[in-house]
């Protein structure tokens, strides 16, 4: 039996107000006067107080990243070319400041600056051959676990799939709960539920082990304190839940919800957080206790999900979603084990999507 030898984030800073230390962290990477940093920042912060706090130097490149649509291989390739055109040398660091999508963009760009070809070539598992540029993740919304994960999820020409690699993992993260204050309620809920769903999929999966179980159980406990108890330190708790949920998946795998959500997102364009919630709400047969508790959380925060979005879609559209979802072999293996292909049929998935 072969055991995973996986990489974790090398350095991390946690605490309210810790964002102020970013300049010091970057100073350690700057060795020459012309060394530059690339800041990839969610454009929701443009013109807001956070913009003035970003430690951009004269030689640096700040790019406002729009993530209204899910990150795509086309977007990553364009951003990579923009960085290459800005300066003939490599940046000493790439900083991703935003939610999971923005952090995934930063991870992907840092990889593509050192690996030839287009990013679609590397969608899959362990296809990246060269280490990335030094890269830093700073979440301004919590839940996805992108700060801890070894993937950067992109919509490509064929499917939605991540650049899964040890080189994808951030070299440094800064977790400052001040930055997630004031996130709009629906977005706060959808993104946080990504963490909760990570935990359910990990704890109910065939890949479960004590490493994953320890992280998932604690992350789930923190999610309950945030979404059911409305704890006064909920921002700090959600930030740690997100990280620990991501760590749980590192030595396990996600499951049916993420597989179905990928099909929804790729074909219908739903963002990852809400896509997961829409999918999870119909997966009682897979995760009965998790779905029941999820609905309690929705009720407490007055969340209403879209319904019947797939009921009347053309058969060919459903077939495309089924194809994307069925292609997620490792996810279904975590649900059913090595014989998953016997159970995950086109008919089963078609019936599932028609209920959404």
Curated annotation (Swiss-Prot):
EC number: 1.1.3.48
Free-text cofactor note: Shows highest activity with Mn(2+) and Fe(2+).
Gene Ontology biological-process entries: lipopolysaccharide biosynthetic process
Gene it is expressed from: kdnB
This protein's pathway: Bacterial outer membrane biogenesis; lipopolysaccharide biosynthesis
Null mutant phenotype: A double kdnA/kdnB deletion mutant shows increased sensitivity to polymyxin B and bile salts.
Entries under Gene3D superfamilies matching the protein: 3.40.50.1970, Dehydroquinate synthase-like - alpha domain (1.20.1090.10)
Reaction equation(s) it catalyzes: 3-deoxy-alpha-D-manno-oct-2-ulosonate + O2 = 3,8-dideoxy-8-oxo-alpha-D-manno-octulosonate + H2O2
Entry annotated with the keyword Metal-binding: yes
UniProt keyword list: Iron, Lipopolysaccharide biosynthesis, Manganese, Metal-binding, Oxidoreductase
Inhibition and activation profile: Inhibited by EDTA.
Species name: Shewanella oneidensis (strain ATCC 700550 / JCM 31522 / CIP 106686 / LMG 19005 / NCIMB 14063 / MR-1)
Cofactor(s) required for function per UniProt: a divalent metal cation
Enzyme class: oxidoreductase
InterPro entries documented for this protein: ADH_Fe/GldA (IPR001670), ADH_Fe_C (IPR056798), Alcohol_dehydrogenase_Fe (IPR039697)
Superkingdom to which the source organism belongs: Bacteria
Pfam family, one: Fe-ADH
Sample GO molecular function, one term: alcohol dehydrogenase (NAD+) activity
Misc note: Kdo8N is found in lipopolysaccharides of members of the Shewanella genus.
The protein's role, per its UniProt record: Catalyzes the first step of the biosynthesis of Kdo8N (8-amino-3,8-dideoxy-D-manno-octulosonate) from Kdo (3-deoxy-D-manno-octulosonate).
Family: Belongs to the iron-containing alcohol dehydrogenase family.
Name of this chain's protein: 3-deoxy-alpha-D-manno-octulosonate 8-oxidase
Presence of keyword Zinc-finger: no
């Amino acid at each position: 039996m072969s055991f995973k030898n996986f990489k974790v984030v090398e350095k991390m800073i946690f605490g309210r107000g810790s964002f102020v230390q970013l300049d010091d962290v970057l100073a350690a990477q700057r060795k020459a006067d012309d060394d530059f940093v690339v800041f990839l920042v969610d454009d929701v912060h443009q013109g807001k107080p956070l913009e003035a706090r970003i430690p951009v130097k004269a030689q640096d490149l700040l790019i406002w990243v729009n993530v209204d649509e899910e990150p795509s291989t086309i977007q990553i390739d364009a951003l990579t070319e923009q960085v290459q055109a800005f300066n003939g040398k490599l940046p000493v660091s790439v900083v991703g400041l935003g939610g999971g999508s923005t952090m995934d963009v930063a991870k992907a760009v840092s990889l593509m600056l050192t690996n030839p070809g287009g990013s679609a070539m590397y969608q899959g598992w362990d296809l990246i051959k060269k280490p990335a540029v030094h890269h830093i993740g700073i979440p301004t919304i919590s839940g996805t676990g992108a700060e801890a994960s070894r993937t950067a999820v992109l919509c490509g020409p064929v499917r939605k799939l991540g650049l899964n690699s040890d080189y994808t993992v951030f070299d440094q993260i800064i977790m400052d709960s001040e930055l997630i204050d004031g996130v709009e309620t629906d977005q706060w809920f959808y993104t946080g539920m990504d963490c909760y769903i990570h935990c359910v999929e990990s704890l109910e999966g065939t890949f479960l082990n004590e490493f994953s179980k320890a992280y998932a159980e604690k992350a789930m406990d923190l999610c309950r304190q945030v979404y059911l108890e409305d704890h006064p330190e909920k921002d700090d708790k959600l930030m740690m839940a997100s990280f620990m949920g991501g760590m749980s998946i590192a030595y396990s795998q996600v499951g049916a919800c993420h597989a179905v959500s990928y099909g929804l997102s790729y074909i219908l364009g739903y963002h990852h957080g809400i896509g997961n919630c829409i999918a999870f709400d119909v997966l009682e047969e897979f995760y009965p206790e998790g779905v029941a508790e999820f609905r309690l959380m929705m009720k407490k925060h007055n969340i209403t999900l879209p319904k019947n979005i797939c009921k009347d879609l053309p058969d060919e559209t459903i077939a495309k979603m089924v194809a994307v979802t069925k292609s997620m072999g490792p996810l279904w293996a975590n649900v059913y084990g090595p014989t998953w292909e016997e159970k995950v049929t086109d008919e089963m998935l078609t019936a599932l999507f028609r209920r959404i």
